[in-house]
Amino acid sequence: GKAASEREGIRTKINIKSTDLSLGAFDWQQEQTVEFILENTGERLLVINDVLTSCDCTTVGYSKEPVHPKDSVALSVTYMAEQPGRFDKIIKVYCNADSSPILLRITGEAK
């Protein structure tokens, strides 16, 4: 409908210092957490609608509040290995930024 397309029209821009973070090598039984920082560089509020992960081993915590222009939001990504081995996980962030969905990646080796 018309309303949806108008909502779609409210876009902002974001900057992410790094979209790809390595957790390095770690004991597979130890939970690992890293932070991705999304900075709202546009002129509108940034709203994160949804964050999807490629498996249950990866969870993401973040503030559900809209992010004001020039402010940032931290996405705290926690990885709990199900077994030892290398991993490469994608996190999809759906938001009202031009580049949505944003793909974030974590890699590493659980030993």
Feature-to-residue mapping (PLM):
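Beta-sheet-dominated interaction scaffolds and their linkers
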Residues: 1-41, 110
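Short strand-edge motifs at loop-to-beta-strand transitions and within beta-strands
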Residues: 21, 71-77
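Buried hydrophobic-core signal for structured, non-transmembrane domains
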Residues: 34-40, 77, 90-94, 106
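Short, acidic/polar linear motifs in exposed loop/turn regions
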Residues: 41-44, 83, 97
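Terminal connector regions
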Residues: 85-111
